[in-house]
């Protein structure tokens, strides 16, 4: 069973006037917040119905400023919470124990695009989509594209090792991070690696920090690998009469030697909700359709893409699918992507919800989806399933509806545990890209025996013996 974090064994000091004076001397009076409407947003992220207020928020704009703030907090036993754009879904950056929140929003410059080496050096507060569009102007491509790419920061993506739809072909954030400048919990500054494509020199600190959710340090500069931007793509929406058929088709597509650049799953309710919410997207969906796959093929040779699309069509006809909608214009392509990327926004406007981030080997998707619906019936909750079927990553949006607060708080988590137990039994894990944060810690025992949790705590202790860096997260 879940073992409560050792965080509570640490004594933390409150931020006093002397500390506030020091913070202001480092970043300036206007960049230290303790009250006001602008301060309010730092108490929450996209995890619903949670509020944890930091005692102060600091907004540095240099590595030296971050280092000075962290060093002071370490010396005075004040907890530090690194914050990106606040798009996290697991309370990843919330100030569980008060202390100082350090936001990276002013570390927002793209420093250099190296077209010769296909690299970009950036600060962590750059919006993901802005970085993608900027390098695209040079004919270059940074593929990881979480649904929050229009608001999330690159630094936050690194914190959770984000993926997104294109991960199925191009990989996740860790596959593009070459080097990181990091402020350690004692205030020291280090580069984790080198700006090279191969590095077998000592332990891989770069990959250790990617996905560490701000528990080991604060990233202040990032070197990313880029690739040439593909010139063409074909996008199609494929309807199925059952979730079983749609999810079974996923594995068959890859077994046929086809590697889509995106392969997304949406059950029928997801599409109905999002189309109603958007209002201006009209996608014809037959009454008997229960699920859809959104599939993209891309590359630099349109003839080859069309042949691959024909091969894909042959595979799909082995399943109970309806008429395939091929997007025949950029506007229609954009509509299909708007529909997929806004499912979560649409569903959560109807009720309080929680979103789980399951991932299994893709052949087992049908079994997982059946189990999710069975658990929902057992615990009397509705759910909407959608996500990155191509790499087995299904998001489960559980809807509170009219459930009592007590039942939602105390019984629904038992259903979530049953879902995660099935996920792990199928060879999967409890988070593919959202991270563990604060809200998912209670499920870590499903995946990891206690000795492995102790190894993680040991790594944390080496970097952060005073446990000031994002305490209360992961374990």
Task: Name each region found by the language model.
Residues 188, 440-475:
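Activity-critical C-terminal alpha-helical subdomain
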Residues 34-43, 224, 228, 237-239, ...:
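C-terminal substrate-recognition/cap domain of FAD-linked oxidoreductases
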Residues 73, 214, 396, 464:
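Conserved, mostly hydrophobic/aromatic
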Residues 32-36, 58-60, 80-84, 91, ...:
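General beta-strand structural signal in soluble alpha/beta enzymes
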Residues 29, 424-436, 465-469:
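Alpha-helix capping/hinge segments and adjacent helical runs
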Residues 109-264:
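FAD-binding subdomain of flavoenzyme oxidoreductases
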Residues 1-71, 87-118, 147, 270-282, ...:
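N-terminal flexible segment immediately upstream of the FAD-binding catalytic core
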């Amino acid at each position: 069973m879940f073992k409560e974090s050792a965080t509570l064994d640490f004594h933390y000091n409150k931020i006093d006037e002397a500390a506030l004076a020091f913070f202001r001397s480092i970043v300036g009076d206007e960049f230290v917040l303790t009250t006001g409407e602008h301060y309010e947003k730092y108490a929450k992220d996209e995890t619903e119905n949670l509020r944890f207020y930091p005692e102060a928020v600091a907004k540095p704009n240099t590595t030296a400023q971050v280092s000075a703030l962290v060093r002071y907090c370490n010396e005075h036993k004040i907890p530090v919470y690194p914050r990106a754009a606040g798009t996290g879904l697991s309370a990843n950056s919330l100030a569980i124990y008060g202390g100082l929140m350090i936001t990276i929003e002013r570390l927002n410059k793209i420093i250099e695009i190296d077209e010769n080496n296909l690299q970009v050096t950036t600060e962590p507060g750059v919006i993901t989509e802005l970085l993608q569009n900027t390098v695209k102007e040079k004919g270059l491509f940074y593929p990881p594209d979480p649904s929050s790419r229009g608001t999330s920061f690159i630094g936050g993506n690194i914190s959770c090792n984000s993926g997104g739809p294109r991960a199925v072909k191009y990989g996740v954030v860790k596959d593009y991070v070459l080097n990181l400048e990091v402020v350690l919990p004692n205030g020291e500054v280090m580069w984790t690696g080198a700006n090279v494509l191969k590095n077998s020199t000592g332990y891989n600190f770069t990959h250790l920090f990617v996905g560490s959710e701000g528990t080991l340090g604060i990233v202040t500069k990032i070197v990313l690998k880029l690739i040439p931007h593909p010139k063409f793509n074909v996008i199609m929406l494929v309807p199925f009469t059952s979730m079983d058929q749609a999810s079974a088709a996923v594995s068959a597509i890859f077994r046929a030697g086809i590697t889509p650049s995106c392969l997304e799953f949406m059950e029928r309710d997801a599409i109905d909700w999002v189309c109603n919410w958007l209002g201006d997207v009209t996608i014809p969906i037959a009454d008997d359709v229960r699920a859809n796959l959104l599939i993209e093929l891309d590359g630099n040779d349109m003839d080859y893409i069309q042949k691959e699309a024909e091969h894909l069509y042959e595979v799909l006809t082995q399943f109970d699918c309806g008429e395939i909608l091929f997007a025949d214009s950029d506007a229609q392509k954009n509509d299909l992507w708007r529909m997929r990327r806004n499912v979560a926004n649409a569903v959560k406007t109807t009720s309080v919800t929680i979103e789980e981030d399951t991932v299994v080997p893709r052949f087992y998707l049908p079994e997982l989806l059946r189990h999710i619906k069975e658990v929902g019936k057992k615990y009397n909750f509705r759910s909407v399933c959608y996500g990155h079927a191509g790499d087995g990553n299904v998001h489960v949006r559980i809807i509170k509806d009219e459930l009592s607060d007590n039942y939602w708080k105390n019984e629904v988590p038992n259903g979530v545990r049953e879902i995660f137990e099935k996920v792990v039994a199928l060879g999967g894990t409890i988070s593919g890209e959202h991270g563990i944060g604060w809200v998912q810690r209670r499920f870590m025992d499903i995946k990891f025996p206690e000795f492995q949790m102790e190894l993680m705590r040991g790594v944390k202790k080496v970097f952060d013996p005073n446990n000031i860096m994002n305490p209360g997260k992961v374990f």
